[in-house]
Regions:
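Mobile, glycine-enriched helix-loop/loop "lid" segments at the mouths of ligand-binding/catalytic clefts
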Residues: 156, 167-187, 388-409
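Radical SAM [4Fe-4S] cluster-binding motif and immediate context
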Residues: 172, 179-345, 352, 357, ...
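Glycine-rich beta-alpha loop elements in corrinoid/cobalamin-binding modules
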Residues: 40, 44-171, 379-385
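Cofactor-binding loop segments of dinucleotide-utilizing enzymes, especially the Rossmann-like FAD-
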Residues: 10-12, 56, 81, 109, ...
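Short glycine-rich His-centered loop
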Residues: 4-34
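Conserved C-terminal portion of the radical SAM core fold
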Residues: 75-77, 103-105, 245-257, 279-288, ...
Length: 499
């Protein structure tokens, strides 16, 4: 084995317009094309000399081109998802036909949750990595034997071996990782990435890993990143911001794509104070527990927008999903965000445990009261590996196990005796109609379009898609929920599942 294997890190082209990879919290084909950066793959890419990161979907690299690229490498690290897994296995077969000697590792939540099932799906997978995989694949590329790599699962003598888990990285180790943005500069075209409610072009990366919140539906803290909140030092984050602004002077904002950015008040304030002299706009994920002092410091430091998962306007549903937040907290948070001038993109979910027709109506009215700048309304999805999946399976509310159709579009798969999938989809339709077709919201959208040509073009495109998808969802609901391609996410509102 050479000193370092020629290594390709791949976010595969599972489906057309598929945002399924290495930071998308809800892998799916987007009806409105949008892509998050493959942040997780950047860290080993920066530690393996001569490596290359290929993010296929946003760069319009198809199966055939991917197979050709793989011919030049000795080691493939493929980030897979539950939604894209079957497609990724088929692609791997083609890759191995073209390069039989290629060594292959699968990484990501699916392998972490189902290591044996993943390995048994294809003889071409040499090993998978459970949990964080930064150092596991780096060690293998440098020649370390599999039986010495923590977190690896692999076949040996006709059985599957699971090595001891690797301890999670903490501040000192996180600070030693390469900057994600160094790899963006080396391997990616940042203009290929867009998220409708962010200012594009944008760049995103993590300032921390993990989330102590216990939301039963949220995949990342229950799989790869964990519930232990582990932070990069403030100085380390600030240096990556400085590099980003130097590398990409064309960007309009930086998005901090942590599971939750504002976990601790003192850190959020310190980061914001260090950001202030750099004079850049930024957005982040947030929970609604921050008070006025913290929000004011963040606004003064350049914060433009928060993505906040409010989920429901029903207090009991919030308790059922262990949200750790209340409707009263949400109201105060929104009031203070308006005071300091920070916009909010609100996430809401229809179909969580305890949902009824009455609670759907309550959540719609609650959302209108909060009056976020933009919203996403999703049907509840029970991702494998989450407490919600275990609960829905145990209680018999999973209508089908499949999370997506053959094109990667999300399928509603939860149904209750008192609330059908079609009724929940109708709730999504009414939610968007009642929210966006209010005079003050229409005026807010028109006003933004009048003064910003970029916003005007974006809004026109999204409005066209909004009406098309609205029509398709209504048709799906009228057919009783059996249409093969229900549109669950909305134009201009898809967050990729941040909560």
């Amino acid at each position: 084995m050479p000193d370092v294997l020629r290594t390709l890190l791949l976010n595969p082209p599972s489906f057309e317009n598929f945002d399924g990879g290495a930071s998308s919290r809800w892998p799916a084909t987007r009806e409105i094309e949008s892509y998050w950066y493959p942040v997780w793959l950047t860290y080993p890419a920066g530690m393996i000399p001569g490596s290359r990161l290929v993010d296929a979907s946003p760069h319009k690299i198809d199966w055939q081109q991917t197979v050709q690229v793989c011919k030049d490498y000795e080691f493939l690290v493929l980030f897979t998802s539950t939604v894209g897994f079957d497609s990724d296995i088929k692609l791997l077969t083609k890759i191995k036909e073209a390069n039989p000697s290629l060594k292959v590792a699968f990484v990501g939540p699916h392998g972490h949750i189902r290591p044996e099932e993943t390995l048994n799906a294809s003889e071409h997978i040499d090993f998978i990595v459970r949990g964080e995989f930064d150092y596991a694949v780096t060690e293998y590329a440098h020649g370390k034997p599999l039986d010495q790599i923590l977190g690896a699962s692999y076949r040996k003598d006709g059985r599957i071996v699971h090595n001891a888990p690797r301890p999670q990285l903490h501040t000192e180790e996180l600070d030693k990782l390469p900057f994600a943005t160094d790899i963006y500069k080396r391997d990616l075209q940042i203009e290929r990435y867009n998220v409708p409610f962010l200012l594009n072009p944008f760049v995103s990366f993590y300032t921390s890993r993990g989330c102590p919140a216990l939301c039963t539906f949220c995949m990342w803290p229950q799989t790869i990143s964990g519930h232990a909140w582990r932070v990069r030092s403030v100085d380390n984050v600030v240096q990556e911001v400085k590099n980003t602004l130097e590398y990409f002077p064309q960007i309009k904002e930086i998005f901090f794509d942590d599971d939750t950015f504002n976990i601790r008040k003192d850190r959020a304030i310190e980061l914001s104070q260090k950001f202030k002299p750099l004079k850049f706009q930024w957005s982040c994920t947030a929970r609604c527990h921050s008070k006025y002092e913290e929000l004011k410091a963040m606004a003064d430091g350049g914060a433009r927008l928060f993505i906040v998962g409010f989920e429901s306007g029903d207090p009991q549903i919030l308790k059922n999903i262990k949200k750790g937040a209340t409707v009263e907290m949400a109201r105060e948070f929104m009031k203070n965000c308006r005071k300091v001038g920070i916009k909010v993109h609100g996430d809401f979910i229809i179909g969580l445990p305890g949902e009824t027709k009455e609670t759907i109506n309550k959540t719609i009215e609650f959302a209108k009261e909060l009056d976020c700048e933009t919203i996403q309304v999703s049907l509840a999805h029970a991702m494998p590996g989450t407490e919600l999946h275990d609960q829905m399976t145990k209680e018999g509310f999973l209508r089908v196990e499949a999370l997506a159709d053959s094109g990667g579009h999300q399928l509603p798969h939860i149904e209750y005796p008192h609330l059908s999938k079609a009724e929940m989809m109708d709730g999504v339709n009414r939610f968007y109609d009642d929210y966006y077709f209010r005079p003050k919201v229409v005026w807010r959208i028109v006003k933004d379009a009048l003064w910003d040509s970029h916003e005007r073009k974006r809004l026109y495109h999204e409005a066209t898609e909004f009406l098309r998808l609205r029509s398709e969802r209504l048709q799906w609901a009228r057919q009783g929920g059996d249409h093969p391609k229900p549109m669950v996410s909305m134009a201009g509102t898809s967050t990729g599942g941040n909560d």
